[in-house]
Amino acid sequence: MRLHHLLLTLLFLVLSAGSGFTQGISNPLSCRLNRGICVPIRCPGNLRQIGTCFTPSVKCCRWR
């Protein structure tokens, strides 16, 4: 019975940790950790948008 609880807990941790990777970048810290920069308008030509920083108008951009 203890083994079932341990396996269920492990499964829960794996599935809950993976759910964060499906969401986009939405704050400045996660933008910087993903090697991005916050740009107040749109990303320049040699950068691509990977998320937002503060609001949807502030983009998180990274080199292509």
Curated annotation (Swiss-Prot):
<keyword id="KW-0929">Antimicrobial</keyword>
<comment type="similarity">
    <text>Belongs to the beta-defensin family. LAP/TAP subfamily.</text>
</comment>
<dbReference type="Pfam" id="PF00711">
    <property type="entry name" value="Defensin_beta"/>
</dbReference>
<dbReference type="InterPro" id="IPR006080">
    <property type="entry name" value="Beta/alpha-defensin_C"/>
</dbReference>
<protein>
    <recommendedName>
        <fullName>Enteric beta-defensin</fullName>
    </recommendedName>
</protein>
<dbReference type="GO" id="GO:0042742">
    <property type="term" value="P:defense response to bacterium"/>
</dbReference>
<feature type="disulfide bond">
    <location>
        <begin position="38"/>
        <end position="53"/>
    </location>
</feature>
<comment type="function">
    <text>Has antibacterial activity.</text>
</comment>
<dbReference type="GO" id="GO:0005615">
    <property type="term" value="C:extracellular space"/>
</dbReference>
<keyword id="KW-0964">Secreted</keyword>
<dbReference type="GO" id="GO:0042056">
    <property type="term" value="F:chemoattractant activity"/>
</dbReference>
<dbReference type="GO" id="GO:0060326">
    <property type="term" value="P:cell chemotaxis"/>
</dbReference>
<keyword id="KW-0732">Signal</keyword>
<dbReference type="GO" id="GO:0031731">
    <property type="term" value="F:CCR6 chemokine receptor binding"/>
</dbReference>
<keyword id="KW-0044">Antibiotic</keyword>
<keyword id="KW-0211">Defensin</keyword>
<feature type="disulfide bond">
    <location>
        <begin position="31"/>
        <end position="60"/>
    </location>
</feature>
<feature type="signal peptide">
    <location>
        <begin position="1"/>
        <end position="26"/>
    </location>
</feature>
<keyword id="KW-1015">Disulfide bond</keyword>
<dbReference type="InterPro" id="IPR001855">
    <property type="entry name" value="Defensin_beta-like"/>
</dbReference>
<feature type="disulfide bond">
    <location>
        <begin position="43"/>
        <end position="61"/>
    </location>
</feature>
